[in-house]
Amino acid sequence: NKKYYDFILNISEDGWFGKSIGPKQHLAHSIFRSIEEGKNVIRSTNNGISAFVNPKGQIIKQISEKGYFDVNKIKRVDKTYFAEHGNKIFFYFVLIYTTFIVILKIRENK
């Protein structure tokens, strides 16, 4: 009995990045997770970029200074293929590719 949550909460301490591109990369990772899982992401940081990202990867609200924002409604979204099956799709691609290569090698040796 797995529970399905409507959002991902990402809490991060980005202070050690300094003035580098690190906080932007962390935000980008959150965007990818929202698309991958088909969930809203609420990202809270102390020295980085806090944001609310919808399941399509669009940044709805964002702040990079001290402050806060309210998230009023989080809509439930259906699971994506990746959320349902995980990395199985990559296994299938490798299996198909390997089978294809083996068939080519067998034909080449005839």
Predicted regions, residues:
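Short, aromatic-rich amphipathic segments at membrane interfaces
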Residues: 66-90
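Short, charged/polar low-complexity linear motifs in solvent-exposed/disordered segments
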Residues: 36, 77-78, 108-110
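Selective detector of the "anchor" transmembrane alpha-helix that sits immediately C-terminal
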Residues: 84-109
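Surface-exposed beta-strand edges and their flanking turn/coil or helix-capping segments
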Residues: 22-24, 56-57, 82-86, 96-98
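CN hydrolase (nitrilase-like) catalytic-core segments centered on the catalytic cysteine
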Residues: 1-69
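Short, surface-exposed, charge-dense and proline/glycine-enriched linear segments
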Residues: 39-44, 71-78, 96
